[in-house]
């Protein structure tokens, strides 16, 4: 397993302000949606569950959690070289992802305020948490001499349109996979404190509960719309979004093995644990999930990661554009083929097992 080479120098737009990472299929994206359609969602099927999730958000359990303590009042120059670059990359992508959620939720809250007050309040509270997370991570970046200009990101980033149904599927998965990423890393570092190289990780235990609560709200929202779980189309969409999220996660983790090694994690096993747990959690909301126990499942994901490494090496080469295109084509085909094979594997009927899922 070979990690993608990170640049030896980080590009800035002005002193101390890092230039945003180049947009690719793997970088966190900014989204917009059909706000009118969201405003017209009928929630009666899950009214009690949505109200319960809303009460959890109102409680704001982490109101005082994201306060930098004395552990941050020291130099982190010992984190240097490739480890420093990998860690800054991790922080930037995490910050961008959280800020992307903030922008979407803030706009949903604003647009729904006079049309769907309950949803508007929920999105306002979700935006509160995402802004808190993004700001905390951005301050962490400053410990390494850089930060992101979030206003600049707002203005310069490309916005991708997703229908509300896609937003519900993807945000639910994003929050739940975020929960597992944080809690598994926290548990690992709790057992192996020698690998805890930065105090941000100490916040992950409570932090991940924000992700969990956000996911619970989107689960209730998803289950309130029968078209998202009670039709044959919804079964295909569920598998599709699980697949795309898991492939993206696998490619991203394998690209950044240097970072995971720096905190004592085996990137391959970490990916297996995150994907397996997220898939099991998704069975509580989705009508179908992927069969992660299939012996070909993870080898196929890892084949996608290997092909992606080839694509990155080609992209970073000095070959002419036409030559690069020809060299990339077979590796792109490998990724597409492996994804098709995973998608066509026999899924797990979560709806049939609903009463057995904890």
UniProtKB/Swiss-Prot annotation:
Cofactor: Fe cation
Reaction(s) the record says it catalyses: Mg-protoporphyrin IX 13-monomethyl ester + 3 NADPH + 3 O2 + 2 H(+) = 3,8-divinyl protochlorophyllide a + 3 NADP(+) + 5 H2O
Residue ranges crossing the lipid bilayer per the database entry: none
Pathway where it operates: Porphyrin-containing compound metabolism; chlorophyll biosynthesis (light-independent)
MF-aspect GO terms: iron ion binding; magnesium-protoporphyrin IX monomethyl ester (oxidative) cyclase activity
EC number of this enzyme: 1.14.13.81
Pfam families for this protein: Rubrerythrin (PF02915)
Function: Catalyzes the formation of the isocyclic ring in chlorophyll biosynthesis. Mediates the cyclase reaction, which results in the formation of divinylprotochlorophyllide (Pchlide) characteristic of all chlorophylls from magnesium-protoporphyrin IX 13-monomethyl ester (MgPMME).
Name recorded for this polypeptide: Magnesium-protoporphyrin IX monomethyl ester [oxidative] cyclase 2
Organism: Synechocystis sp. (strain ATCC 27184 / PCC 6803 / Kazusa)
Annotated gene: acsF2
């Amino acid at each position: 397993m070979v990690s993608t080479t990170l640049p030896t120098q980080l590009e800035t737009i002005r002193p101390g302000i890092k230039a945003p990472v180049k947009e690719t299929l793997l970088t966190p994206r900014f989204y917009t949606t059909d706000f009118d359609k969201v405003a017209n969602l009928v929630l009666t099927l899950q009214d009690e569950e949505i109200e319960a999730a809303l009460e959890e958000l109102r409680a704001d359990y982490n109101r005082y959690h994201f306060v930098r303590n004395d552990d941050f009042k020291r130099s982190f120059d010992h984190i240097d070289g490739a480890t420093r670059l990998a860690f800054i990359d991790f922080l930037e992508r995490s910050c961008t992802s959280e800020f992307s959620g903030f922008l979407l939720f803030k706009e949903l809250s604003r647009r729904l305020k006079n049309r769907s007050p309950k949803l508007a309040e929920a999105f306002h509270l979700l935006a509160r948490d995402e802004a808190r997370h993004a700001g905390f991570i951005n301050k962490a970046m400053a410990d390494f001499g850089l930060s992101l200009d979030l206003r600049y990101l707002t203005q310069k980033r490309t916005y991708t349109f997703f229908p509300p149904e896609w937003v519900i599927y993807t945000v639910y998965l994003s929050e739940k996979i975020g929960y597992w990423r944080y809690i598994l890393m926290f548990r690992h570092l709790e057992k192996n404190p020698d690998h805890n190289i930065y105090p941000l990780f100490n916040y992950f235990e409570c932090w991940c509960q924000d992700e969990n609560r956000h996911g619970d709200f989107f689960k209730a929202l998803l289950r309130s719309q029968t078209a998202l779980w009670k039709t044959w189309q919804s079964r295909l969409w569920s598998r599709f979004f699980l697949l795309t999220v898991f492939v993206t996660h696998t490619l991203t983790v394998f690209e950044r093995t240097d970072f995971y090694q720096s905190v004592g994690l085996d990137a391959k096993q970490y990916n297996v644990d995150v994907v397996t747990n997220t898939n099991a959690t998704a069975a509580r909301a989705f009508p179908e999930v992927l069969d992660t126990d299939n012996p070909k499942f993870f080898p196929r994901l890892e084949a996608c990661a290997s092909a992606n490494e080839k694509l990155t090496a080609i992209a970073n080469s000095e070959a002419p554009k036409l030559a690069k295109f020809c060299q990339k084509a077979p590796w792109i085909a490998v990724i597409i083929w492996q994804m098709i094979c995973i998608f066509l594997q026999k899924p797990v009927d979560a709806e049939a097992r609903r009463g057995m899922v904890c």
